[in-house]
Amino acid sequence: MPAYLKDELSGFIPEEISSEIIKDVARGSSIIRLSKAEEMKTDEKKVPVMTSGAGAYWVGEGERIKTSGASWIYPKLKAKKLGVIIPVTKEKLNDTTIDVFSELRESIAEAFYKTIDAACIFGTSSPFETSLFGKIKTAGNVIPATGKIDIDVSDAMSKVEENGFDVNGFTATIGLKGTLRKLRDNNGASLFIEGTNQKEFYSQPIEFVRNGAWNKEKATIIGGEWKYSLFGLKQGIEFEILKEATLQNTLDSDGNPISLAEQDMIAIKATMRVAYLCVKENAFAAVVPADYDKDVTLSALTIGSLNLSPAFDKDTTEYTATTTAATNTITATATDSGATVEIKNGSTTVTSGSAATWSSGENTVTVKVTNGSKSKTYTVTVTKS
């Protein structure tokens, strides 16, 4: 007899659907498709990695074979919980559990693989200690773009090869495909092969991140020896039915967070546990924008003596403040002295260190930091009472 969702408000998604979701996640995630898979039975797993190999010796007749030691390290894969919440109509409670998750399978998988790629490749909203690109930067294996992508990628491959590794795959932004299609070798043959099941560049597989997770400001393409990129998965996807929550990060058509009780809805929370670790940063290299290292953050932002909410942090771009004064002095300082700062109160330009005049109600202050071709905008909504 089929189980109905109303009778199973929490537990594991049925195995036949869970396994299909995991397959969909693997198909949609570039980092999973390229990395070495590690099955995890617990939340932590030690992975033996050889740092120097054992040696072999020529042995004469009657001679004893020498022994040599190999050096090992044991980095840990640590599984972290990844969750997605999908609001649905309350009528879904009357459907079978299998039918509900069959219908939501694609949405759940897409949310998972986009978040996985963003976290593992670039460290975006990541619970992991480091990311693939973070490791590449630490190793100094970055090639600033020159406008000749074939040469730039060759130079990145050389970085890896100089360290004793071999590039056996790439991952890149989907926007690079058009450029790669135009590349030819000396004989006029295409350097990029767009096959039905496998795409290749420099005769190595290339995976394009098409799920919105790629950060073009950080890198254009990453290549490496992918057995040193480890992805761990703890089997099983859990679910929980939410009935009373307000979904702060899910907005209705009116722009307000969805209140499940008020709107006669439920939400399905699905969670899985995954782990990521790059064990040898020198095995990877990236082609980066020419000005990738240009800093476009602020080191300080003050509006008189007003308290910004949240407290100022260079990586936070949205703030609010309240004032009873007619004017307040705005001061904004770029972290990089070579960057320019443009301040506007509405459409009125304000020089840093000068006063802004407030209208009653909300006033929008924007602070734009520009460094080379990169820019970042901070916004403060100042309410004058």
Give residue ranges: language-model regions.
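Glycine-centered loop/turn motifs
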Residues: 61-64, 203, 217, 353-355, ...
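Assembly/oligomerization interface modules of large self-assembling protein complexes
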Residues: 2-84, 283-284
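Long, low-complexity, intrinsically disordered extramembrane tails
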Residues: 287-293
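Beta-rich interaction/scaffold domains
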Residues: 293-385
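Short, Φ-rich (hydrophobic/aromatic) sequence segments
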Residues: 16-27, 100-104, 108-116, 156, ...
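Extended oligomerization regions of viral-like shell subunits
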Residues: 41, 137-266, 270-272, 293
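Short helix/loop capping segments that flank catalytic or ligand/cofactor-binding pockets
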Residues: 55-58, 96-97, 179-182, 277-279
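Alpha-helical scaffold segments that mediate packing/assembly in large oligomeric complexes
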Residues: 73-76, 84-162
